[in-house]
Amino acid sequence: MSRYRGPRVRIIRRLGALPGLTNKTPQLKSSPINQSTSNKKISQYRIRLEEKQKLRFHYGITERQLLNYVRIARHAKGSTGEILLQLLEMRLDNIIFRLGMAPTIPGARQLVNHRHILVNEHIVDIPSYRCKPQDFITIKDRQKSQAIISKNIEFYQKYKIPNHLIYNSLKKQGLVNQILDRESIGLKINELLVVEYYSRQA
């Protein structure tokens, strides 16, 4: 399954706020699906499916990518759900978004693809690159790159930067300070339901 390229508002009306996908907020009105199921018990499968879809659309990844992340998380020590979220949050495109250097994760992915971003002074053009503690995220020393990201920071760095990240506005430099904790996730999600959804596939 490829990445979703349709209307983003339609997605957030169904799944709720997804800041990684769009900075728009859903209108509080019932969709036809909600109206038709208001008097019916929603199946457990559907609940798990919607939680899975939240992760997919928020982080802008394909079904195959998400399944691979679940498999990696299952083989790691610790809570599978929390490790899954850590893997997604430590993607380079998400780090750029959480630092306020891009308005959305798709916007951050575009910056990476166009080679505007350096990690530890080396250009990285892979959005899924897994960042680690003590990685420095900087902007390519080019006027166009600097202008794009400076404008983004001015408009979009209004949300509190999570504790595992640090941004130096003078140097225009981000730092991955540590592995994030569960409280720093920028999405309302029940990751255990996602793990349960993939229980027979991972």
Curated annotation (Swiss-Prot):
Keywords, alphabetical: Chloroplast, Plastid, Ribonucleoprotein, Ribosomal protein, RNA-binding, rRNA-binding
PROSITE patterns hit by this protein: RIBOSOMAL_S4, S4
Classification via SMART domains: Ribosomal_S4, S4
InterPro entries in UniProt: Ribosomal_uS4, Ribosomal_uS4_bac-type, Ribosomal_uS4_CS, Ribosomal_uS4_N, S4_RNA-bd, S4_RNA-bd_sf
GO biological process: one example: translation
Domain S4 RNA-binding: 90-153
Gene Ontology CC: chloroplast; small ribosomal subunit
GO terms, molecular function: rRNA binding; structural constituent of ribosome
Location (main, coarse): plastid
Localization annotation: Plastid, Chloroplast
Quaternary structure and interacting proteins, as annotated: Part of the 30S ribosomal subunit. Contacts protein S5. The interaction surface between S4 and S5 is involved in control of translational fidelity.
Family statement drawn from the similarity comment of this UniProt entry: Belongs to the universal ribosomal protein uS4 family.
Function of the protein: One of the primary rRNA binding proteins, it binds directly to 16S rRNA where it nucleates assembly of the body of the 30S subunit. With S5 and S12 plays an important role in translational accuracy.
Protein name as catalogued: Small ribosomal subunit protein uS4c
Organism: Splachnum sphaericum
